[in-house]
């Protein structure tokens, strides 16, 4: 996963629509079968401070293959850590609230340069 990297990859995301999610209000878009590809980028802490996005595989995403995940309020979308996904700007004038939770396998290695951690953090 780009933002919650583990070795081996184990991140799963749960995205719950608190309101209907449509193309107009910024629903998620995803690449069918994209979870079968390699990780393309990784967000990590830089030595000396700050964070950076590094490229692991420079092959561009084929955005024309992405499909909208329009869902009704209460729907839970489960996202594999390697699945390319994004949302576009909300152009509707109404909100699109969602609740997201991510989980990783405690047996996977969570590198010390992952961006999400505190100096005393031990999540695994």
Q: What spans do the regions from the language model cover?
A:
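Short, P/G- and charge-enriched loop/turn segments at secondary-structure junctions
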Residues: 1-4, 64-66
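Short capping/connector residues at structural and topological boundaries
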Residues: 2, 8, 17, 33-36, ...
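Sterically constrained small-residue positions within well-ordered secondary structures
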Residues: 5, 60-62, 92
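Non-heme Fe(II)/2-oxoglutarate
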Residues: 43-45, 73-78, 82-124
């Amino acid at each position: 996963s780009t933002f919650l990297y583990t070795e081996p990859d184990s991140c799963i995301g749960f995205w719950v629509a608190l309101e209907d999610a449509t193309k107009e209000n910024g629903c998620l878009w995803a690449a069918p079968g994209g979870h079968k590809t390699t990780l393309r980028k990784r967000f990590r802490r830089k030595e000396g401070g700050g964070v950076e996005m590094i490229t692991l595989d420079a092959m561009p995403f084929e955005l024309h293959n992405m499909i909208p995940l329009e869902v009704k309020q209460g729907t839970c979308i489960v996202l594999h850590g390697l699945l390319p996904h994004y949302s576009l700007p909300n152009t509707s004038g109404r909100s699109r609230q969602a609740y997201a939770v991510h989980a990783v396998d405690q047996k996977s290695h969570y590198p010390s340069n992952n961006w999400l951690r505190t100096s005393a953090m031990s999540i695994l």
